[in-house]
Amino acid sequence: MKGNKSHRSGFTLIEIMIVVAIIGLLASIAIPNYAHSRGAAHRAVCINNLQQIDGAMQRWSLEMQKDEGQAVTYGDIRSYLKGSVVCPAGGTSFEDSYTITTVDAPPICQRKPATHKLAP
């Protein structure tokens, strides 16, 4: 007697559900870590930019013999900066990324002032 066995190849519903669950678990671990790493990188770049701006302000004030409290603008220090200085957390230009006021005041990030700041 010959049986009516048909051999089907493929995955069962349970196997597919297990694979989907594993992929979901891996994604739930990887995505928050990626977002945290990206935020930390943005913060590091912005703090480096703030240090460059502060150094440019100090060099400008020494060369121009400006006292503490003297006003400073981006136009004054532009030649002391290398390339464009923009906050990576969403800035498009220096003016919408950073605020500078006086020679003795540190520059401020407009995008994330609470976390993107120079150490005192």
List the model feature ranges, each with a label.
Residues G55-P120:
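Extracellular/periplasmic head regions of type IV pilus-like filament subunits
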Residues M1-F11:
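N-terminal leader/signal peptides at the extreme start of proteins
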Residues V20, I47, D54:
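Conserved catalytic core of two-component sensor histidine kinases
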